[in-house]
Amino acid sequence: MEQLPSNLQVLLQAAEYVERREREAEHGYASILPCDPATPGRRKRQRTNSNPDNVRSVHNELEKHRRAQLRRCLEQLKQQVPLSMENSRHTTLSLLHRAKQHIKKLEDQELRAKSLKEKLRVEQQKLRQRLKQLLPPNTERIRTDSLDSSTLSSERSDSDQEDLEVDVEGIILSGNEGELFVSFSAGLEHSYSTPAHAWL
């Protein structure tokens, strides 16, 4: 994300330069360096030693290569930026301005997502502390890396295992404790029922 704005500025400058050169070519003039009257003999020798046709052909090839590279970059940018359907033809400047607005929009969304993630992390930590306070001290808890995989190691008898309830987070509860945790879980679901777009 940090390199995109700098690349965009380069493309904007290149597009303005190309349009300025095209306008100059249409009017039949170009920017020429002023002649230095102090050294006429040196400039005359440079003109005689260099072939104007070769210089012009090299310049044309370099300009052609640069325009082709710029065109490829603009085509790639057009695929990444959502364009308006009102106008089928988009100029280079309008495309670059839309790309700049799109980058700003993505940066704002990233900031809001980070803020939401931090709020959820703090809320999750508070809920874990509350859950730890509600659970009795002799309750066995399983540490799991994910909700899909959990292991249970206990030396309880088979009759004791039948009276226990295991929730999705690997917390072993007895009958009365299970009812308490069900009501608490309902409160957790209610706290997370806020739509995601409210934060975004």
From Swiss-Prot:
Keyword GTP-binding listed? The answer is no
> Which GO MF term does the entry hold, naming one?
protein dimerization activity
Entry GO terms, CC: nucleus
Disulphide bridges, residue numbers: none
Recite the UniProt keywords alphabetically. Answer: DNA-binding, Nucleus, Repressor, Transcription, Transcription regulation
Enumerate the spans annotated as bHLH domain: 54-106
Localized where?
Nucleus
Which Gene3D superfamilies is this protein grouped with? Helix-loop-helix DNA-binding domain
Q: Quaternary structure?
A: Efficient DNA binding requires dimerization with another bHLH protein. Binds DNA as a heterodimer with MAX.
The molecule here is called: Max dimerization protein 3
Organism from which the protein derives: Xenopus tropicalis
Question: Its encoding gene is what?
Answer: mxd3
